[in-house]
Amino acid sequence: MKVFLSGYGKMGRMLEELALERGWEVVGHADIPCPEAYETAPGADVCLDFSGVGALKPLLGYLRRTKTALVSGTTGLTEPDLDALQELGRELPVIWTANYSTGIAVFRRMLHD
């Protein structure tokens, strides 16, 4: 499975380690301080997103450009942000949760299965 990481802080690095342990290919990562990285990032089967609100606009552009599915645990999203994710869900598979413990459980199960 090809994985793109959106948000490369503590959580992003942990997800990278788990993905690599499972034999998944991490095709790249981007973060808020460098939003232009989303513009040139390669497509993936799924984007694992633990970034921040500031990354949402470039992230949505990346997902639409590459037709990559999204699993996100980003918190602090506004109603318009959630509406944008819901709209994206009409085009691509999208899973979002703001509860980190639930999000981690989902990621662990995904990585285990």
Q: Can you describe what each PLM-predicted range is?
A:
Residues 1-3:
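Extreme N-terminal starter segment of soluble prokaryotic enzymes
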Residues 54-57, 61, 74-99, 105-113:
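Rossmann-fold NAD(P)-binding glycine/threonine-rich loop
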